[in-house]
From Swiss-Prot:
Keywords: Electron transport, Heme, Iron, Membrane, Metal-binding, Mitochondrion, Mitochondrion inner membrane, Respiratory chain, Transmembrane, Transmembrane helix, Transport, Ubiquinone. Heme b b566 binds at residues 98, 197. InterPro entries: Cyt_b/b6_C, Cyt_b/b6_C_sf, Cyt_b/b6_N, Cytb/b6-like_sf, Cytochrome_b, Cytochrome_b_C_euk/bac, Cytochrome_b_N_euk/bac, Di-haem_cyt_TM. This is Cytochrome b. Heme b b562 binds at residues 84, 183. A ubiquinone binds at residue 202. Heme 1 (or BL or b562) is low-potential and absorbs at about 562 nm, and heme 2 (or BH or b566) is high-potential and absorbs at about 566 nm. It is a multi-pass membrane protein. The gene is MT-CYB. Binds 2 heme b groups non-covalently. One of its GO terms (biological process) is mitochondrial electron transport, ubiquinol to cytochrome c.
Amino acid sequence: MAPNLRKSHPLLKMVNNSLIDLPVPSNISAWWNFGSLLTICLLTQILTGLLLAMHYTADTTLAFSSVAHTCRNVQYGWLIRNLHANGASFFFICIYLHIGRGLYYGSYLYKETWNTGVILLLTLMATAFVGYVLPWGQMSFWGATVITNLFSAIPYIGQTLVEWAWGGFSVDNPTLTRFFALHFLLPFMIVGLSMIHLTFLHESGSNNPLGIVSDCDKIPFHPYFSLKDILGFILMLLPLTTLALFSPNLLGDPENFTPANPLITPPHIKPEWYFLFAYAILRSIPNKLGGVLALAASVLILFLAPFLHKAKQRTMTFRPISQLLFWILVANLLILTWVGSQPVEHPFIIIGQLASITYFTILLILFPIVGALENKMLNY
């Protein structure tokens, strides 16, 4: 009998073990769709980004015009740009839901998978940041200036570091050129990290909503979950195309329709919506270094998740108090996102400070305490 090429060919064998014959817990819900959705996001972004890069000029005098030219004169250039800009938003929606799923169902106990995931998040944030600078509008320029300037808060080497990153004494042509180079490079780094992420995941196998060992009840990925994932693709690509075709500038900043001008500062400098929660935490601390540390901690705190797990049960499925706390955390993040978009004045300052304190308190103090409390409750 001829050998099955899918199972014997060195390359096809890897694809087969990852996407076809992969044993998957039979009870995973739609919350497990986001890994494949993120893959689709990444591929879409790389494809549209490559097409945009063919028409883009990384020069301060030409960048803005080259983007306008792409939208006006290139065949479907407007669509490619709108898909790329809004695709970033959907990328972040998916990754935040993916992380939320991981926190809720205790997936962070697969430490290697979780840690590579957090590194992926940081890389994605860096990619989105440098990408936002490329159109060279007002918000691009001032966003780059404000965020890179934060590194000057690092004692002793800060100022040198910032000037080294800028390639001069202010954000200028060298900065734009290197940001374009980085924006082109980082997505491929994300692809590599995703493969590592997937390798670690397939070492242990997927978690499931019950958080119990599922070795006795697994089914092949194809056709069951490959088909289920296609539903997810449709449910994501439909709103993405709707947004890109009907309201492409809904999530953008009107300031970015004005070419960058170092002599005029916009009244409210703020990042894209997906960074607002971290931006609100940064702004809530009046000290520069303190703000930078809080900003870093707001994301790096995810590395601590496995060590803060004190519950005997893995998931929150049967832990009602932890569930309540989790949804309070979600609401808190939405409040932070809203506050980050508002001007720095009363009452937004105090709301931001309270929400920032709540964010760290829930993650660092309340989750472990409630986990231990629920362990006690299991004994009664």
